[in-house]
């Protein structure tokens, strides 16, 4: 891990992720997922994400109370491959090749440090060529891994997609310095439909939730 600290900026390079604070309440990130970290290359094979966001306190017009708002932008690419990715025979593939290039905006509003909700919208394009997935993956395989090109003989077709997302986050104090926290997501649209939730215990006296954007304050 490499840390470079100055008075107003910091930069962290760690396992393919690059993050830097642009101001007290904002972040810029470059994040890479790759299943070769785990010695395999199938299904969700690669993800590359350029991220920017910020959060700030704002006053409500009616009550003059402060609440938190965070906004996030992500430019990303995801690649999926079958487990037998060297075959060119469709009947031997358990999963199609898939490329997904997208731009996402999301906004979260926290009425207090332990209760928040959000929404988001994603625009993108699928397809081996349009998403640049085939070119990106084969270039990486040839130049970095010294492997043969993958066939991409059967892939999800090229199309423009729109997806929407909602989220809900909360925290409940169990006892001093122990809090039960959860965050739930729902996504629906023309490219992906799904739901997920995560929960756990937050230890310590730090206010807020671990899901509150990238905590750089």
Q: What function would you assign to each model-found segment?
A:
Residues 66-68, 175:
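Edge/loop elements at the starts and ends of beta-strands within beta-rich repeat scaffolds
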Residues 1-29:
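Bacterial Sec-dependent N-terminal signal peptides
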Residues 34-36, 40-47, 69, 77, ...:
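Histidine/cysteine-enriched polar flanking segments
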Residues 1, 54-59, 204-207:
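Short regulatory "switch" loops immediately downstream of catalytic or recognition motifs
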Residues 24-32, 68-78:
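Transmembrane beta-strand segments of Gram-negative outer membrane beta-barrel proteins
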Residues 73-217:
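Outer-membrane pore/translocation modules
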Residues 25-62:
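N-terminal ordered "arm"
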